Amino acid sequence: MLFMVMVFLGVSKNADAKDKYVTERGVNRNTTIKGISVVAKQYEEAGSYKYKIIMKKNGVKKTIAKNTTTDFTTNGKIIYYSAVVKKISSYETKNCIYKYDIKTGKYTKIISGKSYVVSGCSGRYLYCGIDMEADGIKLYAYDLKKKRKKYMTSVVANVLVDGNHVVTSTNSGDAGNYPINFFKLNGTGKKKVCDGSLLKFENNKIYYFIVRESDWKYKVYTCKYNGKQKKAMTGWVKKIPEKYGWD
């Protein structure tokens, strides 16, 4: 059985679209947008490993927060991240999500909860939820204006936002074809688009791959966010081309 962690692999992400948020969930993977670089770095404290969010602007590095999760999202003006408040058990923590204004240096507390992490942002809506590790994320759309949350779905691996839509993939330890779902920005209107593993979502097109378990080969497809206009982009291949979002 082939084991696969359903997250995007890669060293860095770059984006310059106006006010578009870019989300990262890994350690030591830089996200650069509007000349601002943000990264979650591991450090050791009192014999245990923790994480901190570091920003680099005009060549100068600044530690935004220590004892955080590895998840953050930024548009080059704002950084949303999750800080650990206290340990609840050997695998659970109480976390608080903060907003950091890069221009003013102001911190704003957004929402807190058990094992809360940041998964994405559309501007008005922050996508966050409970990290249940192997069982994925229990995802909510948090209305930053009205300060209330809407449950979206569970067992989430990745969240991608483009235009007026949100797409989520399903978390699994094994390579396979699992539901990819579509939502409106406010977290409503859930609809299953297809089965597979999500690669990227841009210009209202979803890129994903399916697995052939007989020989563990992959085929990349694209379709509209509503599941229509499905088209194969590759044949059965052993490695997914990087241009489709898999590094």
Predicted regions and their residues:
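Repeated scaffold domains used in trafficking and secretory/extracellular systems
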Residues: 23-32, 66-76, 113-123, 153-163, ...
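Short, conserved, GDST-rich strand-edge loop motifs in beta-rich repeat architectures
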Residues: 42-45, 84-92, 171-173, 211
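Sec-dependent N-terminal signal peptides
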Residues: 1-3
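Intrinsically disordered, low-complexity segments enriched in Gly and acidic/Ser/Thr residues
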Residues: 156, 169-181, 192-203, 207-218
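Surface-exposed loop/turn elements that mediate protein-protein interactions on large endomembrane-trafficking
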Residues: 17-24, 46-65, 90-112, 134-153, ...
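Residue position within the beta-strands of beta-propeller blades
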Residues: 39-41, 80-83, 126-129, 166-170, ...
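Sec-dependent signal peptide cleavage junction
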Residues: 6-19
